[in-house]
Amino acid sequence: MFSFRTTALEDQLDKALLDGRVGCFCTQNCWDTARGRYMYDLFTERGNLKALFSPRDAELTPGTNHIMFDKEALEGLDAVVVEIQDAGARYFNYSKDVFHLMETLAGMENPPSLYIVDHINPAGRIVEGSMPSGDVEAHTPKVAHRHGLTLGELCDLWYNEIGATFALHVISALASDSTRQLLPWTIAPASDIPGMFTCEMYSGGGLWNNTTITPAIGTARPYEYLGAPFIRHNRLEVLPAPAGVLMRPCTFTPSTGRYEGQRCNGYQIMLQPGTEYHSLLHTLQLMRYFLERYSQFELLDGFESKIADPDMISYLKGEIPFLDLREHVKLEEQKWIRKAKRYSLYEDQPYRIK
């Protein structure tokens, strides 16, 4: 059973929420601006909060990027309320944790009802890339790299993909005062998604995590910067860059991650005002550029299952030209948009950069 609800969580009259045993699955993004409390405080005040699932460490702590749970902790609950901020790309760990939660509920004999308190997608309705083909990371739905959907819409899609039968209720992002009072990135969605531009960079930038070039994890501007100790700047060098994108040579020293404490040479990706940035295509161009110039640049374990697109791998290997890749991505984006529209819960629709 699926329902889409347009009134706020505290106004829901379901017995499971009013009198039942409730578990809350959330990050710092469940802050209620109107009432000055977190979502789970509602159930603490009602006296029926029985479980709280949240990241292990304080927010913005490097490496804090999963919500841990087990099936036993879900047994006996009447409702699980989820409120996280998705980041717009299918690799986002907290969203994959929600999909893992849904898989677990689908396998339970008496699962609790699942409530998703939806949020606006900080990466907007733009889509990039393709649906997975072949091996793919665990708990990953068949959506484009940058999907253009909200978490609630993704959960509706995943619910159908896994053939779930538990009750799923999505509470509209427009029902929340927080949506009207805050931009979706005001409270950082995760330790590596800290700012306004991060989500625009993440659909491509997230792929660097499975290479020997770091996307500046452990700095204040991850995914806007990239680099490695082996990169050498050359004043005459011309990096691939689409219209409206500038590449500034820079250095940085990450406080954590692959090159913790090491000076990295690299680049800052800067977007001119009004630019609609196709992070995925640009990242693939940069990767091919570095693969052709640095023997130290490698694609590591997990890269192929993360990108999950044979044509993109062929491009990186130099087997097809960029024009062929771009046409492939165009067709795949059109295919994804047709599918995505079936799960759209809001007036604005996913679209591609032309």
Regions found by a protein language model. Name each.
Residues 47-49, 105-113:
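A short helix->loop->beta-strand "cap" motif at the edges of active sites that frequently abuts
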Residues 4-11, 61-73:
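Glycine-rich, highly charged phosphate/nucleotide-binding loops
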Residues 135-205:
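Conserved anion/nucleotide-ligand pocket segment
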Residues 60-61, 115-136:
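Glycine-rich, charge-decorated loop segments at or immediately adjacent to ligand/cofactor-binding or catalytic sites
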